Amino acid sequence: MIIYLHGFDSNSPGNHEKVLQLQFIDPDVRLVSYSTRHPKHDMQHLLKEVDKMLQLNVDERPLICGVGLGGYWAERIGFLCDIRQVVFNPNLFPYENMEGKIDRPEEYADIATKCVTNFREKNRDRCLVILSRHDEALDSQRSAQALHPFYEIVWDEEQTHKFKNISPHLQRIKAFKTLG
């Protein structure tokens, strides 16, 4: 089972395309939708939905995957639910760059301070990070600096922030999922 978390643009047709691409790894791909506008509510909702899926799951090696803001959530929810994560261009600093787009961006900073201390150290090697060199929305070098001490970083030379085509990375994701 692969759980897919969309980014800030929840209505993007690219979400459906990514789900279809992920089905080449595992036919059981589940999209979990969330508001993107209310961080604390989103965290509760995502934890509840992912936990429910895991309770009914038969896959011994489930995976959670997210793009952009979905990558922010996939890393945290995956850690809290003890499943491996794959994140594409994760938005690591939404409290800085979501101002004016969501109701309370400061809630992201609050969530970060309430999360498990040094959670990335405790999550070491359980997250695969795929970053675009042509991310027009986020500073991928800053993301790499924050994540490289803990996770493997894969660089993509073609895609932009929304990562429309993930197919060149499917074999790597499949191998990472298999490690479970």
From Swiss-Prot:
Can you name a GO cellular component term?
cytosol
Q: Which GO terms describe its molecular function?
A: hydrolase activity, acting on ester bonds
Q: Which InterPro entries match?
A: AB_hydrolase_fold, UPF0227, UPF0227/Esterase_YqiA
The family annotation for this protein states: Belongs to the UPF0227 family.
The upper taxonomy is: Bacteria, Pseudomonadati, Pseudomonadota, Gammaproteobacteria, Enterobacterales
Q: Which NCBIfam families match?
A: PRK04940.1 (NF003431)
Name of the protein in question: UPF0227 protein YcfP
